Amino acid sequence: MSKTLLIMAAGTGGHVMPGLAIAKTMQSRGWNVHWLGTTHGMENRLVPPSGLPMTLLKFSGMRGKGWKHTLLGMFRLVGATWRAWRLMRELQPQAVLGMGGYVTVPGGWAARLAGVPLAIVNADAALLMSNRALVKHAKRVLFGFDGGAATLGGMAFKARVTGNPVRAEIVEIASPEQRFADRQGPLRVLVVGGSLGAQVLNATLPKALALLPAEQRPIVTHQSGAQHIDALREAYAAVGVQAHVVPFIDDMASAYADADVLVCRAGAITVSELAVAGVASILVPLVVSTTSHQRDNARWMAEHGAAIHLPQQEMTPQRLALLLQELTRTRLLAMAHAARELGRPMAAETIANELESIALPVQGGKHS
């Protein structure tokens, strides 16, 4: 009889995509996988093509919207925990894995109530708020990076640094030495703004490149997101700078392999991909009032010599132009080496091993 894993992941692609990679690995080991998500996150678009059965909870957190929202959120949290507990009674999973998103808190508490071993993945360098609520209930806390958060203080016995799962085609990218072997001419800069486009990158890059003498300008590919592509093309044209502006990049592995350096945000999965691929980067983290995870990710990469951390408030055209002007292929190759040293290409397999180490036997365990 097959074992069952319940994966909890909701909200962003950074939570969902690694969960799908782990699901595929567990299925290859003979496990059944069921997904627990929310009614409004990206899991509703990303999970169905995989064919995984999915249960959705109506829960969207409790922070930042006044005491009435908090009170209502508490009631919804109790209700979501109850529904998750009933699901576990029905599925009788041997293990539960939390990948992040609002669903992990009620799902994690339900796992504790149902007596099912819980593992949580902390993709970022800093400990996620939702994971802080679950650390004491988890059998394993699996970290994407080996920063200070991975010590877990007095609960270090639960912590494992596994890395974050990345796509197979990223793992297969040639080494930095092979890629840089015959490169000549202008540097190749890849700007990645994500599906919605990072507006600070769109606003700054054309102006920064215009400050460079024409003979010193790099070859630029700028992924803008569909919403901003026309305005970005006009911005480059207005300052007389040539750039290949695209809404999306379908083959990201080839784009990574062709680039000397990326300019991008510092989400956990992006940083993990840069490390596994061995690509130098200028990281401009998104910092909002409720979280600084990207800043911590960027600092971690910079401290290891794998990236340049450029805080958004310091990202002026003048500062970026100076950074680009100072970069050489020799320096970028050294950064690419440092990034590659940080990569954990076997993260999905390592996480699968940890799940199997804590799993209940098919016929045993307490589910009450």
UniProtKB/Swiss-Prot annotation:
The keyword Protein transport does not apply. PANTHER family: GLYCOSYLTRANSFERASE (PTHR21015:SF22), UDP-N-ACETYLGLUCOSAMINE--N-ACETYLMURAMYL-(PENTAPEPTIDE) PYROPHOSPHORYL-UNDECAPRENOL N-ACETYLGLUCOSAMINE TRANSFERASE 1 (PTHR21015). Pathway: Cell wall biogenesis; peptidoglycan biosynthesis. GO terms for molecular function: UDP-N-acetyl-D-glucosamine:N-acetylmuramoyl-L-alanyl-D-glutamyl-meso-2,6-diaminopimelyl-D-alanyl-D-alanine-diphosphoundecaprenol 4-beta-N-acetylglucosaminlytransferase activity; undecaprenyldiphospho-muramoylpentapeptide beta-N-acetylglucosaminyltransferase activity. It catalyses: di-trans,octa-cis-undecaprenyl diphospho-N-acetyl-alpha-D-muramoyl-L-alanyl-D-glutamyl-meso-2,6-diaminopimeloyl-D-alanyl-D-alanine + UDP-N-acetyl-alpha-D-glucosamine = di-trans,octa-cis-undecaprenyl diphospho-[N-acetyl-alpha-D-glucosaminyl-(1->4)]-N-acetyl-alpha-D-muramoyl-L-alanyl-D-glutamyl-meso-2,6-diaminopimeloyl-D-alanyl-D-alanine + UDP + H(+). Keywords: Cell cycle, Cell division, Cell inner membrane, Cell membrane, Cell shape, Cell wall biogenesis/degradation, Glycosyltransferase, Membrane, Peptidoglycan synthesis, Transferase. It comes from Methylobacillus flagellatus (strain ATCC 51484 / DSM 6875 / VKM B-1610 / KT). It comes from the Bacteria. Belongs to the glycosyltransferase 28 family. MurG subfamily. NCBIfam families: murG. It is a peripheral membrane protein. GO terms for cellular component: plasma membrane. Cell wall formation. Catalyzes the transfer of a GlcNAc subunit on undecaprenyl-pyrophosphoryl-MurNAc-pentapeptide (lipid intermediate I) to form undecaprenyl-pyrophosphoryl-MurNAc-(pentapeptide)GlcNAc (lipid intermediate II). This is UDP-N-acetylglucosamine--N-acetylmuramyl-(pentapeptide) pyrophosphoryl-undecaprenol N-acetylglucosamine transferase. It is found in: Cell inner membrane. The gene is murG. The keyword Cell division applies. The lineage of its organism: Bacteria, Pseudomonadati, Pseudomonadota, Betaproteobacteria, Nitrosomonadales. Its EC number is 2.4.1.227. It holds the Pfam family Glyco_tran_28_C. GO terms for biological process: carbohydrate metabolic process; cell division; cell wall organization; lipid glycosylation; peptidoglycan biosynthetic process; regulation of cell shape. UDP-N-acetyl-alpha-D-glucosamine binds at residues 12-14, 167, 195, 249, 294.
